[in-house]
Design a protein with these regions (language model features):
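Domain-edge interaction signal
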Residues: 1-198
Length: 198
């Protein structure tokens, strides 16, 4: 089970709000955080914040991160302010990204560039149109790393024993080999073997 990195989660949220330069709705921020976690997993074969992920009726979210902004913790203590239009950086906050690596920042910036300027309604339309195929509308369930990986590649499937398999390559292509090891390296090998664009 991954360890939740609270400081990284706070700095990731701060980075996205800093890029926004204004308030972002709670739904939009939580979805952008999920997309960043997902992109980091697919690129680097490990979780960014370590938060568990859940499919909720309105969309996927990082449960540990959502708890930071739900009132169970004090967002103000971490430099965030609630407003009528969502969360923003507090005016007294000078964001620091000391806990974020260059890869972390690149992932956050990439997600912002792709989705940050979209409205909450536009993000919901993208979700309904398959932005995150591991999420199904109206379903509440845990989202595992394996489900994300399987959802992005038609070549990968899970057999009844929960082993990950790669279907045979199409005729005329080189045979792909799969080494399945637990942990991040297994996911890395699977992602490369399946030809997933990362």
């Amino acid at each position: 089970m991954p360890v939740f990195h609270r400081e990284k989660a706070i700095e990731l949220a701060a980075r996205l709000l800093w890029l926004a330069g204004t308030s972002v709705s709670a739904f939009s921020l939580l979805l952008l955080l999920y997309l960043a976690e997902r992109a980091f997993l697919l690129r680097h074969a490990e979780r960014f914040t370590g938060s568990s992920a859940e499919a909720l009726p309105d969309g996927p979210m990082l449960t540990d991160v959502a708890a930071l902004f739900s009132g169970e913790a004090s967002p103000a203590a971490d430099g965030f302010a609630r407003g009528p239009h969502g969360l923003r950086l507090a005016t007294t906050c000078k964001p620091s990204f000391d806990h974020l690596s260059a890869a972390d920042i690149e992932t956050a910036d990439s997600i912002w560039a792709q989705f940050g300027k979209l409205s909450e309604a536009e993000l919901k339309v993208l979700l309904q149109n398959g932005l995150c195929p591991e999420w199904q509308s109206g379903v509440t369930a845990t989202i595992t790393d394996t489900q994300i990986l399987v959802a992005v590649s038609s070549d990968i499937r899970i057999d009844p024993q929960n082993d990950i398999k790669i279907d045979p390559p199409p005729k005329g292509t080189k045979e792909r080999h799969l080494t399945c090891r637990p942990g991040k390296f297994g996911f890395c090998v699977i992602a490369v073997a399946a030809g997933i664009s990362l």
